[in-house]
A protein has these predicted regions:
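Claisen-condensing/thiolase-fold acyl-transfer catalytic domains that form or cleave C-C bonds
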Residues: 1-168
Length: 168
């Protein structure tokens, strides 16, 4: 129960970010190492009256489809345009609450339109890299009750290089 107000929503900021998607073949042909590998994606429509909750619903769907549990993930990056997103996550997933938005979320650093998805994906990739995590989810609620989630695995540069050498 509660009300969304300017006091518990993020600010709108200017910003820019990008994430490059490439095939494994393209990367190997250019001797490049990816930061992460996409393992799954989900999109869900939820109650448009409570759009902030749609991100976690998308994550639940994705994990169910992949046969995973919240405890199988090392990090969660949710675009928390509203404080209720973090509050609800911490209430529902107490055992993994410390894995959500470790570097802060949109309430802390703002909500740059057009860059939010790339921004949370970059945060997730860097958190997994620095903390030697293996798997994480980036999720975002969108207007009209749409929720989207992406599951990624961290790519270990040494393992990637060794695999490349085995195939050459």
């Amino acid at each position: 129960e509660g009300i969304l107000t300017a006091a518990n929503t993020c600010t709108i900021n200017d910003g820019a970010a990008f994430v490059m998607l490439a095939s494994e073949r393209w990367l190997r042909e250019r001797d490049l190492v990816p930061s992460a590998e996409i393992k799954g994606f989900s999109m869900i429509g939820a109650d448009p009256a409570v759009p902030p909750l749609s991100a976690d619903l998308a994550v639940s769907l994705l994990l169910r489809d992949k046969g995973l549990f919240y405890s199988d993930l090392d990090a969660f990056e949710y675009n928390e345009a509203f404080a209720v997103i973090s509050a609800e996550f911490r209430k529902k997933h107490r055992d993994v609450a410390d894995r959500l938005n470790r570097w802060g979320g949109a309430l802390a650093y703002g909500h740059p339109y057009g860059a939010s998805g790339a921004e949370i994906m970059i945060h997730l990739m860097k958190i997994l890299e620095r903390e030697e995590g293996k798997r994480g989810v980036a999720a975002i609620p969108a207007a009209g009750g749409v929720g989207e989630a992406v599951l990624i695995n961290n790519v270990d540069e040494r393992e990637w290089t060794e695999e490349r050498e085995r195939h050459t």
